[in-house]
Amino acid sequence: MGIIQTKDLNLYYGNVQALKKINLDFSANTVTALIGPSGCGKSTFLRTINRMNDLISTVKIDGEVMFEGKDVYKDYDEIELRKRVGMVFQKPNPFPMSIYDNVAYGPRIHGIKNKGKLDEIVERSLKGSALWEEVKDRLKKSALGLSGGQQQRLCIARTLAVEPEVLLMDEPTSALDPISTLKIEELMDELKHKYTVIIVTHNMQQAGRISDNTAFFLNGEVVENGKTEDIFYKPKDKRTEDYITGRFG
């Protein structure tokens, strides 16, 4: 059994069904790419895993989302869940404060006040997001002065600072230039040694480069999922082949 499982997961926005009987199993220490055309349910699905959809009043969910064998909607407080299942969004969203304070923000909320401990967490997290060498001499400067790619790696460091087990990434490179994108992709290969990574991407080449497993979403359903090399080179469903080869999407 994987670290995360979904069983017959359905999600509705009011009367509109956005996810239909999603059954997926995510193994620990892997990168899984969620692919599919715009509006197919990838990001909606990602947000069910750490209950971000709770913030939308019209959302109704049935079925199960299991994290380490427990139902995230019944057995977890959402604050604790989001600490253990972190999220990185499409656009970098640094807080308007120093680089140091951005990374220390989460640990402080969770009660860590000792400066030595915070220093250690900040350095470890920035090293974990491959940003430390670029910012170690300006930790007290505003995070808003960083480039877009640096800001996104800062957001990853901020997520790592609270020691999650799973990282959810919603198109984390779509707003970045090719060089910054490459740095994030290289980082993901490192991150999977410590974390389980689930990434939504529209970039087929990116999905092929970075992921161990891939799930193809279409119209709120999972058409096919499995090892990335099988999905890309030996798809079982013609719709998967048509999407990956660019015939639609």
From Swiss-Prot:
Coiled coil stretches, renumbered: none
Subcellular location: Cell membrane
ABC transporter domain residues: 4-244
Membrane topology designation: Peripheral membrane protein
Binding site for ATP: 36-43
SMART domains tied to this protein: AAA
Record EC number: 7.3.2.1
GO BP terms, alphabetized: phosphate ion transmembrane transport
GO molecular function: ATP binding; ATP hydrolysis activity; ATPase-coupled phosphate ion transmembrane transporter activity
Keywords of the record: ATP-binding, Cell membrane, Membrane, Nucleotide-binding, Phosphate transport, Translocase, Transport
Any matching Pfam family: ABC_tran
Recorded GO CC terms: plasma membrane
Annotated catalysed reactions: phosphate(out) + ATP + H2O = ADP + 2 phosphate(in) + H(+)
Family as reported in the entry's similarity comment: Belongs to the ABC transporter superfamily. Phosphate importer (TC 3.A.1.7) family.
NCBIfam families registered for this protein in UniProt: 3a0107s01c2 (TIGR00972)
Subunit description: The complex is composed of two ATP-binding proteins (PstB), two transmembrane proteins (PstC and PstA) and a solute-binding protein (PstS).
Biological role stated in the UniProt entry: Part of the ABC transporter complex PstSACB involved in phosphate import. Responsible for energy coupling to the transport system.
Name assigned to this protein: Phosphate import ATP-binding protein PstB
Native source species: Clostridium acetobutylicum (strain ATCC 824 / DSM 792 / JCM 1419 / IAM 19013 / LMG 5710 / NBRC 13948 / NRRL B-527 / VKM B-1787 / 2291 / W)
Lineage of the organism: Bacteria, Bacillati, Bacillota, Clostridia, Eubacteriales
Gene, per the UniProt record: pstB
